[in-house]
Amino acid sequence: MPSLWSNESDGSLREHLVDVVVSGSEPKIRVHDLTRVADDGSRILKGVTIDIPKGMIVGVIGPSGSGKSTFLRSLNRLWEPPESTVFLDGEDITNVDVIALRRRVGMLFQLPVLFQGTVADNVRYGPNLRGEKLSDEEVYKLLSLADLDASFAKKTGAELSVGQAQRVALARTLANEPEVLLLDEPTSALDPISTENIEDVIVKLKKQRGITTVIVSHSIKQIQKVADIVCLVVDGEIVEVLKPSELSHATHPMAQRFLQLSS
């Protein structure tokens, strides 16, 4: 059975994960010994090894500067990982055409960036690049998935709140029919109501489309709400992998301190 953690030397963690990972689940993403070295020689990521099962929402939390965003961006080659370190459905992503990869592995950032034109123009952007035309009904359906009604289709970015713009950016990403969603602090700039809307959409996408999701967040409450599994990252390493309900059981000293200060 594949686990979320593949460090053979840490038997206690592997045994614990028997109860965390769904039996028989296959990894959608496999990361093996992923390391990134900064220009000054320091290591941003230190041999990260993890399996992410298909259809799960994996939360990634930890102190600022611990390597969370670097890890996330390596999964769709926004940061180019070394060969044979990141695999999607068993295939080394460095061998996959980068445009095709980013269609399969979509990403949403902290601040939404919309293109000129209407909301509908934004949603159609990816399909248009592929020579595909989305009907109005298809646009409305994608907006609905992002918790926006059809009336938004004709609006421009200037008419939207930041929370609404973030949901348009999500609908635009969904138009590419991604198998995986990478979310880099997607609600940190949003008000509580908009944050709740995005969280509800994340859970809905898992239930309705089975999308595998990796979300980086500083909000413990958010991760406990949406995630199936939580990875705690400290100093470039995944030091704990727990169920959301078990975060209080973290044993790594820095992870414990982060959780205490964040709660």
Curated annotation (Swiss-Prot):
One of its GO terms (cellular component) is plant-type vacuole. Pfam families: ABC_tran. CDD domains: ABC_PstB_phosphate_transporter. GO terms for molecular function: ATP binding; ATP hydrolysis activity; phosphate transmembrane transporter activity. Keywords: ATP-binding, Nucleotide-binding, Transport. InterPro entries: AAA+_ATPase, ABC_transporter-like_ATP-bd, ABC_transporter-like_CS, P-loop_NTPase, PstB-like. SUPFAM superfamilies: P-loop containing nucleoside triphosphate hydrolases. GO terms for biological process: phosphate ion transmembrane transport. Belongs to the ABC transporter superfamily. ABCI family. This is ABC transporter I family member 17. It comes from Arabidopsis thaliana. The lineage of its organism: Eukaryota, Viridiplantae, Streptophyta, Embryophyta, Tracheophyta.
